[in-house]
């Protein structure tokens, strides 16, 4: 009996969650997410929200927790891309600032370092800065209602990679040895190829 009560309670919770999601999403779709959804997306989502609401008060009044969860997941599949666009719009500037702060920090940190360290770190910083600038320009011409070409998570990954590489360079006092690039033997033979006039 307790197990049956538990199932009924879970189903009730899932139904309430689905119902709340329908109302919340309808509100956000025409307010918060307005500029982040295409007209066809808004139309499709509105239609699905209306169908779900009608189902909840007609056929879906007494279903299992799994049925309500499945309905919720179906709606989220439609809404999640829009929510990602909205959230990433706010997260990108902060992530970009963090990356630019890291670049400035490393540029300042290597000013008195040996030339090989300074040049290697400055090259990594320039590469990260150029990547950010190019991607930001691409993103700036995109409408807000399409999936971003530059995600804040990509900027964070670039900042993490920059931190790892620059720290390795500064610890080893020189450019990191990149195992995939076996050109170290080329550097030793270059001196013999020079000709005098």
Regions found by a protein language model. Give the residues of each.
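PAZ/PAZ-like end-binding module
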Residues: 1-197
